[in-house]
Amino acid sequence: MGNQAGNNNETRDLLVGIDAGTSVIKAVAFDLSGRQIAVASVPNRYTTSADGAATQSLDQTWTDCAQTLRDLGAKVDGLAQRTRALAVTGQGDGTWLVGAGNKPAGDAWLWLDARAANTVRGLQEGPASRARFEATGTGLAACNQSAQIAHMAATMPDLLARAEVALHCKDWLYLNLTGVRATDPSEASFTYGNFRTRRYDDAVIEALGLSAQRRLLPEIIDGTQITHPLSADAATATGLLAGTPVCLGFVDIVLTALGAGIHTEGAAGASCSIVGSTGMHMRAMRNEDVHLNAEGTGYVIALPVPGMSAQVQSNMAATLNVDWVLNLATDLLKQFGTTLSHGERIKCIDGWLQSGRPGSLLYHPYISDAGERGPFVDPNARADFIGLTSESRYPDLFRAVVEGLGMAARDCYTSMGIPMPDELRLTGGATRSRALRGVLGAVVGAPTRISTREEAGAAGAAMMAAVALGVYPDMDACIAEWVTPLLGQAEAPDAELTQLYAQLFPAYRKAREALVPTWDETARLLKSRYRPNALSAGLN
C-alpha cells in the first residue's frame, strides 16, 4: 500500500477530528463508536494591536495543524494505517484570503478584529439591512467576514486584488489538506446566504455592497455528503496516508454543541450553553420554527442535520468575569506576600458560592472592554454591582458574579422569542463545578446536565465524517451512540432559589436598560484618554 490509503476498512478503525480554535489547535482520535483514544494540541498564535487589529499567520496555522497530527501519530500506534477519515473544524468568522498558487494573500483577520466597526454601522443603516438579517438570521458585527471584506474594499483594495478566494480558518486547513477551495453551509449561509437554503443569496451579497467581490466566495460543500482525498503533500506534512478521506466540518461552535447534546432524540426543549471565555446560548430548531428578534441580534447557524439550525445568542464575557473576581483576591493577597495558584483558586469556587448570600447583589457581567453583543449590542456596556452595603463581603461578590452569568444566559434565552429551556446542557471548563451549575440552573429555571465528552468540537467534526463514510446512516443514529450515552444525570435546581432569581430577573433587565445613558456618558468622558480599541464581538 505504501503511502497511499487502501480500501481495507477492517483495519481502519479510527476517525480523527481537528478543532483549530482561537486558543488551541487540537487533533483528537476516536474509535468508530465515539470513544476518545488520544489528543494532541499546540497553542494557537495571533497578534493584536492598538488599532483593533487581530491577525494570524495562515502558514503558521497550517504548520501548527500538521504538527498536531504528527504528534497524535506519535501517541497512537499505526495511526496513519488506522485512520478511516479526517475531519476539520475551527474558529468562526474572520477572513482568510488566499491568492495565486493557494498562497496567503496576507495575514488572516480573526473574529477578534475590530477594524470594520465603522463599516458595520454604515451597513446597518442601509435600507436592506433588515432583509439581510431575515435571510442570514445573523446580526452584522465587525467579526463577520462580510463586514471585514466590505471594510477592506473601502480601505485596502490592493489586498483584495491579490486575493482569489476568501476562506475561514477551517476552510484554509481543508485547502491545505486536500487542495480544494471550499467552505461549509453553516458559515456560508450566516455570512452571505440564507439559513433555510444553505446557499449564497445574491440579495444579501448586494445588501452588503459586495457584488463586485462575489468572485471571492468559494464553493459550498456539505461534509456529511462529500469528502476529498488527503493530498500527497499533506500526507508528507502530517504523517497520514495520501488518499485518506477528509471531511470539511461546520463551524466549531455548532459542532461543539452537537457533541455536547444540543440535539438528541426526545429532548426538543433542551438548550445548550457553552460557558467559556464567552457565553454561547443555543437551541436546535427546525428552520421553520426559528424566531428572528426585532433587535436584529444573534446568529442562526445550520446544523449538520437536514432542516435544522442552532438559534444562537452570545454574550461577550462569561468566565472572563470569574477570572476578574478571582484576580481581585489574588492581587490583594499578593500585597501581603501570599500567592494562590490557579488550581488553589479553582478549589475555592464552591466554598465561596456556598457562603455567599443568594441574590444579595445584582451584577451585570459586561466586563469586556468591547462591551456587549447579545442579546443587545452596545460597545459602551460595562459591568457593575448594584446593592452593595457595609455587610457585603467577598463571597457575596463572587456569588453575584456567577449569578450574573446566569442572568445573562436568561437574558439571551428570553430574547430568542421561544419557550425557555426545559433542560440546560452545559459545556465549558467552568461547568465542572457542581455549585456553579446549580446557580446557572436556578437562574435560568431549568435542570442542568453535562456530558463526559472532553473534546466536543473535534467529536462533532468526526461525527460528520462518520456519517459521510456510512459508518452511520444519518446524524441522528450517530448522536444516539456518540452523544446520548455520555450525558450525565439531570440536576434539578433548588426550587427556592429558582423562585428568588425569577423575581430578581426583571430588576436585572430594567437596570441594564436604565444604565445605557450612564455607559454612553462614561465613554464620552474617557474618550480623551488613550485606550486601545476594544475587540469586536464574534464567534470564537
Where do the language-model regions lie?
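N-terminal glycine/serine-rich phosphate-binding loop of ATP-dependent small-molecule kinases
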Residues: 1-107, 235-236, 240-248, 444-448, ...
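Active-site core segments that coordinate phosphate-bearing ligands/cofactors
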Residues: 2-6, 16-17, 124-136, 147-182, ...
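Residue-level signal for inorganic ion chemistry
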Residues: 34, 57, 86, 113, ...
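Structural signal for short hydrophobic segments within the conserved structured cores
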Residues: 38-42, 218, 489
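A generic structural motif
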Residues: 43-45, 111, 211
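Short beta-strand-loop/turn "lid" adjacent to the catalytic site in phosphate-handling enzymes
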Residues: 76-111, 139-143, 174-194, 219-224
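A conserved helix-loop-beta module that forms one wall/lid of the active-site cleft
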Residues: 209-221
